[in-house]
Amino acid sequence: MANSGLQLLGYFLALGGWVGIIASTALPQWKQSSYAGDAIITAVGLYEGLWMSCASQSTGQVQCKLYDSLLALDGHIQSARALMVVAVLLGFVAMVLSVVGMKCTRVGDSNPIAKGRVAIAGGALFILAGLCTLTAVSWYATLVTQEFFNPSTPVNARYEFGPALFVGWASAGLAVLGGSFLCCTCPEPERPNSSPQPYRPGPSAAAREPVVKLPASAKGPLGV
């Protein structure tokens, strides 16, 4: 049967990864400006995410603005949005399936084989969610790196990796690792009972020999 301890470990790892995927999707710090300004008093930090761009001043004031148009966004931002939203949805479905399929829950106890397969399906969806997140974050980071090292990019327009990218990488790793643990707990199919049958001794040799009855005329005077 499936190892319930390994299932619980995989579930909580994948659940933490899914929460991190949600946080990475919502955070606006996918890339941050590496130029602080010439004057410390007027320094402004710029952040950009999938849904908004923010500016934080040295006084602590932060102003954020949502992107006005969906069609006006760059293709990599739209692709990253789609991948992250798909990852969040896959993680939600995987969470439900994993709860139903884990051995420690009471749902579907009458069919442990089907219950184990449901847990494996949940683990596979967690892995897909992690891969979607890993693709979106890595693709975005690659473009940020290319823009940073592009000689034609002005110094005040160069960006570096934001905290959301690191959260996304860590969350993707947790989701893939937890989903792998759930997939590794596949229950073995039940085998027919092959226990040896109890030994039953056959009839004795004396019992197997036929009994010959003599006719009455062949008996002696004493009846023998």
UniProtKB/Swiss-Prot annotation:
Variant or mutagenesis effect after changing residue 57 to E: In HOMG5; localizes throughout the apical part of polarized epithelia in a diffuse pattern; more than 90% decrease of homomeric interactions; loss of interaction with CLDN16; loss of cation-selective paracellular permeability; no effect on interaction with CLDN18
Chemical reaction(s) catalysed: Mg(2+)(in) = Mg(2+)(out); Ca(2+)(in) = Ca(2+)(out); Na(+)(in) = Na(+)(out); K(+)(in) = K(+)(out)
One BP annotation, GO: actin cytoskeleton organization
Effect of residue 90 to P: In HOMG5; localizes at tight junctions; slight decrease of homomeric interactions; more than 70% decrease of interaction with CLDN16 associated with impaired functional synergistic effects on ion selectivity; partial loss of cation-selective paracellular permeability; no effect on interaction with CLDN18
Principal location: other
Membrane topology category: Multi-pass membrane protein
Compartments, as annotated in UniProt: Cell junction, Tight junction; Cell membrane
Effect of residue 81 to W: In HOMG5; partial localization at the lateral membrane and partial intracellular; when overexpressed in the retina of PN0 mice, leads to retinal degeneration characterized by altered morphology of bipolar cells, shortened bipolar axon and dendrite lengths and decreased light response
Record-level Gene Ontology MF annotations: cell-cell adhesion mediator activity; identical protein binding; paracellular tight junction channel activity; structural molecule activity
Cystine bridges: 54-64
Ranges per topology, Extracellular: 29-81, 139-160
TM annotation in the entry: 8-28, 82-102, 118-138, 161-181
Domain of life: Eukaryota
Region annotation Disordered: where it falls in the sequence: 191-224
Entry-linked PANTHER family: CLAUDIN
Associated disease: Hypomagnesemia 5, renal, with or without ocular involvement: A progressive renal disease characterized by primary renal magnesium wasting with hypomagnesemia, hypercalciuria and nephrocalcinosis associated with severe ocular abnormalities such as bilateral chorioretinal scars, macular colobomata, significant myopia and nystagmus. The renal phenotype is virtually undistinguishable from that of patients with HOMG3.
Known role: Forms paracellular channels: coassembles with CLDN16 into tight junction strands with cation-selective channels through the strands, conveying epithelial permeability in a process known as paracellular tight junction permeability. Involved in the maintenance of ion gradients along the nephron. In the thick ascending limb (TAL) of Henle's loop, facilitates sodium paracellular permeability from the interstitial compartment to the lumen, contributing to the lumen-positive transepithelial potential that drives paracellular magnesium and calcium reabsorption.
Family listed: Belongs to the claudin family.
Assembly information from the UniProt record: Can form homo- and heteropolymeric tight junction strands. Interacts with other claudins including CLDN3, CLDN10, CLDN16 and CLDN18 with highest affinity for CLDN16. Interacts (via PDZ-binding motif TRV) with TJP1 (via PDZ domain).
Protein name, entry field: Claudin-19
Organism: Homo sapiens (Human)
